[in-house]
Amino acid sequence: MKFNPRVSSSRRKNRKAHFTAPSSVRRVLMSSPLSKDLRNKHNVRSMPIRKDDEVQVVRGTFKGREGKVMQVYRRKWVIHIERITREKVNGSTVNVGVNASNVMITKLRLDKDRKSLLERKANGRAAADKEKGTKFSAEDVMENVD
């Protein structure tokens, strides 16, 4: 159900917005889930993927392969990973693009901006968890029973 009247439900408009999205929006759309240990450590489920992150492919032809992200190719919506290549007919090797949603981040490249992003996301998640289940107090429930 749509709550905000300014948000379109039109398939045509959503596809246009997706495929003409600027690089700054594509960065967020090209996010990948974190591994279980990173998720527990940082209390964050996913992050925008970035060059020099270490990832593991979890779906597709290259499932199980691991490597470092060499390039995030936002124009093509793919990432290039070390050692995931294909040999062309003329003998040269080219990187094969992998969808960011098909990989899992196993090691983050952290700098001050990324650390602050992790903190912000973790704080927001902690606040949401704290509010969860406190919509009604026990007294409110018992009041309405009678």
From Swiss-Prot:
InterPro entries: KOW, Rib_uL2_dom2, Ribosomal_uL24_CS, Ribosomal_uL24_euk/arc, Ribosomal_uL24_KOW, Translation_prot_SH3-like_sf. Pfam families: KOW, Ribosomal_L26. Residues 119-138 have a biased composition (Basic and acidic residues). GO terms for biological process: translation. Keywords: Ribonucleoprotein, Ribosomal protein. The lineage of its organism: Eukaryota, Viridiplantae, Streptophyta, Embryophyta, Tracheophyta. This is Large ribosomal subunit protein uL24y. Residues 1-20, 119-146 are annotated as: Disordered. One of its GO terms (molecular function) is structural constituent of ribosome. Belongs to the universal ribosomal protein uL24 family. It comes from Arabidopsis thaliana. SUPFAM superfamilies: Translation proteins SH3-like domain (SSF50104). GO terms for cellular component: cytosolic large ribosomal subunit; cytosolic ribosome; plastid. Residues 9-18 have a biased composition (Basic residues).
